[in-house]
Amino acid sequence: MPRTCADYEERRDKALELFALKGFGQVSMRELAAHVGLTAGSLYHHFPSKQHLLFDLIEELYEELLATLHPSGRGRDATARLSAVIRAHWELHAERPLQFRLAERDLCCLSEEQQAQIAGMRQDYEQRLLALIAPTSRLSGPALQASAQVVASLLNSLPGWLQNSAAPEAQRLALMESMLRGAIERGLPAGISSAA
């Protein structure tokens, strides 16, 4: 990677750390510039705006979430697909915990247009998720949409909730899978248990 790209990524990662630590709205441009090793005036040569940087970080997370739903596992049964999706989310959360925090907490700091773009990505993610793990659910309309939102929220929040547990990682992952499987089997009639 050329040095300028590496510098950009390093500054972006430092900005992510600061936003996650303090909250996007609590970080001034001057503080952001100092934290990433730039002057306030030169910051705009590297990032169009603080808000654009936040959008870029959240958008990247949703692109990664969509990638976890790649259809390569479609030939397996629904139980195996769910296990693969859970493991992929667990690993993504381990790699990007700060981006998950930003996406949950600071989404409201984006412009209406940026929020709409992220909402579209999230809706696409939720629909693909349900198509992959519960393709035969008897729910439809608003009930199916609400179920998709709940399952997606659980997938994206459970790793963070479980990270401070004293239980070994394998146990935490098994607990996450058990909770999600129960929610899907009970909440999505004829969902995962009968899907193949």
Regions found by a protein language model. Give the residues of each.
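Helix-turn-helix
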Residues: 6, 10, 14, 18-52, ...
